[in-house]
Amino acid sequence: MRLTQKQIVWLKVLLHLAGLLPFLWLVWAVNQGGLSADPVKDIQHFTGRTALKFLLATLLVSPLARYAKQPLLIRTRRLLGLWCFAWATLHLTSYALLELGINNLALLGQELITRPYLTLGIISWFILFALTLTSTQAAQRKLGKRWQRLHNFVYLVAILAPIHYLWSVKILSPQPVIYALLALVLLAWRYKTFRQWWRSFAGKML
């Protein structure tokens, strides 16, 4: 039984709640002292993990819609991508304002040099920014075939973001490994498309 348009609308409502509720919980935890002795790191990791969850959910939509024969599921992909960018922006903002401090933002360039994992994170954010700006139907019509080539760069984010997470933790724990493995599974699930994109991307880089 295929999902109806009305059910998709309700699904989008639930996805909006899934994007908003973690933020409300985080605000509550900060105000109630529900974080650890290093709340800045807690906030950074929480926002980053939530962004990763939405990234993985975005990557899951296309193969799930195809194999479950639910074409209307595709309509949730943009929403998930927007929430991914929103949480990635919160993640970047928490680092810039809470760790560096508003008076030390000029140090960001130096930080990118001394901490390469930050470079991977910044690259991922800029890609998500570009994908968000061009996520509308108007942008899709204007860009034509280039739109799909641009939005295939989400695959690069799916590679860089888990590496960024793995590299950033001082003590390796199962959680970043699980995210990395899930990203690999989702890329392998669309092996042909990913292989074509990778060959094109690698060819231009070399």
UniProtKB/Swiss-Prot annotation:
One Gene Ontology cellular component annotation held by this UniProt entry: plasma membrane
Subcellular location: Cell inner membrane
Keywords assigned by UniProt, alphabetized: Cell inner membrane, Cell membrane, Electron transport, Flavoprotein, FMN, Heme, Iron, Membrane, Metal-binding, Transmembrane, Transmembrane helix, Transport
An MF annotation (GO) of this entry: heme binding
Principal place of residence: membrane
Keyword Nuclease found: no
Essential cofactor(s): FMN; heme b
GO biological process annotation, one example: protein repair
Residues spanning the membrane: 8-28, 82-102, 116-136, 153-173
Record's bilayer topology term: Multi-pass membrane protein
Bound cofactor: record note: Binds 1 FMN per subunit. Binds 1 heme b (iron(II)-protoporphyrin IX) group per subunit.
Assembly with partners or alone: Heterodimer of a catalytic subunit (MsrP) and a heme-binding subunit (MsrQ).
Protein family: Belongs to the MsrQ family.
Free-text function comment from the UniProt entry: Part of the MsrPQ system that repairs oxidized periplasmic proteins containing methionine sulfoxide residues (Met-O), using respiratory chain electrons. Thus protects these proteins from oxidative-stress damage caused by reactive species of oxygen and chlorine generated by the host defense mechanisms. MsrPQ is essential for the maintenance of envelope integrity under bleach stress, rescuing a wide series of structurally unrelated periplasmic proteins from methionine oxidation.
Record protein name field: Protein-methionine-sulfoxide reductase heme-binding subunit MsrQ
Species this protein is from: Citrobacter koseri (strain ATCC BAA-895 / CDC 4225-83 / SGSC4696)
Organism phylogeny: Bacteria, Pseudomonadati, Pseudomonadota, Gammaproteobacteria, Enterobacterales
Gene that this polypeptide is encoded by: msrQ
